């Protein structure tokens, strides 16, 4: 800190300067040009600060102590600026690409030592040193080695040493040749086994295919398309043999549980139309089944259908000259037709009719509806089994609607 004319001057520098008389004259010329505005000659950090002191310093002494930014720039442009020595050394441990800000721009240009160009090294150069040279055997050597290998693939050390001397080869070369030859044989055996396995599999595949083709595919027995409540537990042939034993011509009574009609046949109109067509025709008919069909039309090839009715409690329906193989379908057909007709008549009956009906005792009311089918067999057919003469259906209906339902059956059959 220096004082001049009641002003305090602060100077901050980090450089060690060696000024020659030539430099002093240069600074004096700069100060003379700046005398018009003395404050402009100072650096912003070295401008005078007013103080109360009254001591004065000569102008020449102040010029030697003050360094402005313009003086430093001018000194850097001088030819003999090599005398300016920085007070620190550049860091050599870090590369300029990683820390560019830490490497200052050198003011002094030092002559660089030219680097000697180094020959480029290929990437495979390190491997070439460790890689062994490939030995080329002459035809005579290869023939002799092959003959010895056929005789003994695992040669003893003494014999291998003698063989190497006779062939003018080293023992390691002979040993390596035998190792490579054994590895080649191993690869050949693996490939041969794989090819044999492939050929065997190709030969066996046609036989498997032919055996699968010769196996007959079991055909599914034709079943009626009905709801889940009614399922056929055995094929028709078993049912026919059970219903019509070949040695016993006696009558067989079967009891079949009755199911709700709305779950068995939703399309009652189709069945009613079918019944009308059967009653009006006297010749065999060909039917087109609906989708899905209730029964197979081929199973109902009837020659003639006659509906018999009476005033008794028993409703009798007769079929003439029907084959035994179609009996199962006939029973199902007659059973369903009777139930649907009764339900339709019962739903449309007037409530006034129920007043004229006699009362039924409570003990006569049953918990379920049972239909008994009585089959009468007479004689035998021409190749189709016994001929069915009559099929009688007996309706036992529950509740107060007993008699009314039976009368409904008779009325419907009477209109036919």
Swiss-Prot record:
Q: Name one Pfam family in it.
A: Homeodomain
Molecular functions per Gene Ontology: DNA binding; DNA-binding transcription factor activity, RNA polymerase II-specific
A single Gene Ontology CC term: nucleus
Mind listing the UniProt keywords for this protein, alphabetically?
Answer: DNA-binding, Homeobox, Nucleus
Which stretches does the entry tag as region Disordered?
Answer: 103-144, 178-247
Which SMART domains does the record cross-reference, listed alphabetically?
HOX
Q: Where is the composition biased (Polar residues)?
A: 118-127, 219-240
The lineage's top-level taxon is: Eukaryota
SUPFAM superfamilies of this UniProt entry? Homeodomain-like (SSF46689)
Main localization of the protein described in the UniProt heading: nucleus
Specify the DNA-binding region ranges: 130-189
Q: Where is the composition biased (Low complexity)?
A: 103-113, 193-218
According to the UniProt entry, the coiled-coil residues are: none
Please state where this protein is localized. Nucleus
Matching PANTHER family, A to Z?
HOMEO BOX HB9 LIKE A-RELATED, HOMEOBOX PROTEIN CEH-62
Protein name per its UniProtKB record: Homeobox protein ceh-62
């Amino acid at each position: 800190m220096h004082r001049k004319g009641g002003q305090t001057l602060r100077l901050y520098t980090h450089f060690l300067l060696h000024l020659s008389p030539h430099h002093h004259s240069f600074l004096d010329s700069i100060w003379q040009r700046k005398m018009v505005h003395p404050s402009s000659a100072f650096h912003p950090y070295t401008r005078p600060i007013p103080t109360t002191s009254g001591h004065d310093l000569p102008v020449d002494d102040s010029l030697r102590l003050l360094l402005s930014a313009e003086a430093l720039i001018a000194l850097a442009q001088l030819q003999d600026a090599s005398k300016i020595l920085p007070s620190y050394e550049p860091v050599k441990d870090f590369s300029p690409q990683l820390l560019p800000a830490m490497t200052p721009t050198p003011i002094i240009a030092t002559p660089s030592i030219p680097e000697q160009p180094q020959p480029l090294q290929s990437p495979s150069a390190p491997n070439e040193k460790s890689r062994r040279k490939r030995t080329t055997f002459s035809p005579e050597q290869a023939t002799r080695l092959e003959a010895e290998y056929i005789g003994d693939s695992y040669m003893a050390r003494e014999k291998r040493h003698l063989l190497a001397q006779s062939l003018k080869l080293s023992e390691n070369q002979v040993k390596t040749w035998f190792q490579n030859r054994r590895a080649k044989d191993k690869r050949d055996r693996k490939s041969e086994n794989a090819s044999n396995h492939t050929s065997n599999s190709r030969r066996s595949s046609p036989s498997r295919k032919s055996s699968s083709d010769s196996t007959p595919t079991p055909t599914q027995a034709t079943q009626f398309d009905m709801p889940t409540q009614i399922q056929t537990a055995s094929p028709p042939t078993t049912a026919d043999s059970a219903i019509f034993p070949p040695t016993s011509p006696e009558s067989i009574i079967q009891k079949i549980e009755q199911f709700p009609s709305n779950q068995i046949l939703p399309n009652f109109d189709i069945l009613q139309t079918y019944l009308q067509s059967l009653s009006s025709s006297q010749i065999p008919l060909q039917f087109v089944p609906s989708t899905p069909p209730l029964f197979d039309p081929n199973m109902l090839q009837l020659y003639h259908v006659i509906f018999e009715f009476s005033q008794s409690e028993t409703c009798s329906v007769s079929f003439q000259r029907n084959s035994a193989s179609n009996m199962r379908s006939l029973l199902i057909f007659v059973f369903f037709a009777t139930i649907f007709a009764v339900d339709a008549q019962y739903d449309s009956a007037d409530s006034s009719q129920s007043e004229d009906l006699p009362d039924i005792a409570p003990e006569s009311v049953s918990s379920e509806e049972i239909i008994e089918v009585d089959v009468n067999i007479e004689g035998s057919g021409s190749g189709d089994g016994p001929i069915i003469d009559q099929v009688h259906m007996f309706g036992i209906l529950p509740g107060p609607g007993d008699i009314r339902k039976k009368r409904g059956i008779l009325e419907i059959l009477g209109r036919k």
